[in-house]
């Protein structure tokens, strides 16, 4: 019973995160529309509220294209893996229903966010384009250099919070 409750809680968490991101995108498009002195997306439904769902339908019905010389499997798996990594980050956040108990939730957060950049490198490598590969390697180098300082700052905060 505990496993089913945890599974339902995890599924509900994923659905709520994805829907909230869709509506935050709608909010961003509305704000950008008002900045440009236009209304933004307002053609679908009442004030454009169903627009994220229409965008999702349009996204799923689009034709899938890929570069001719690319490594097909890793080219499509890397964005999916990146999505799963970004959803795993939400597991260490405290909620009303305790999904998983992490003693080292901060370390789990740092690990998941640091792995996210490698999906960019795999996507660049699998496209068999030199420019995409260089962009992926540049993203990895930047992330590694910033993660060292981020980890040191985070561990310093954790260290001095117990004193």
Curated annotation (Swiss-Prot):
Matching PANTHER family: NADH DEHYDROGENASE SUBUNIT 1, NADH-UBIQUINONE OXIDOREDUCTASE CHAIN 1
Enzyme class: translocase
Similarity comment text for this entry: Belongs to the complex I subunit 1 family.
Physiological role: Core subunit of the mitochondrial membrane respiratory chain NADH dehydrogenase (Complex I) that is believed to belong to the minimal assembly required for catalysis. Complex I functions in the transfer of electrons from NADH to the respiratory chain. The immediate electron acceptor for the enzyme is believed to be ubiquinone.
Record's keyword terms, sorted: Electron transport, Membrane, Mitochondrion, Mitochondrion inner membrane, NAD, Respiratory chain, Translocase, Transmembrane, Transmembrane helix, Transport, Ubiquinone
Compartment(s): Mitochondrion inner membrane
Protein's UniProt name: NADH-ubiquinone oxidoreductase chain 1
PROSITE patterns cross-referenced by the UniProt entry: COMPLEX1_ND1_1
Main localisation: mitochondrion
EC number: 7.1.1.2
Superkingdom classification of source: Eukaryota
GO process annotations (BP): aerobic respiration
Signal sequence, renumbered to the chain: none
Organism: Drosophila ambigua
GO CC annotation terms, alphabetical: mitochondrial inner membrane
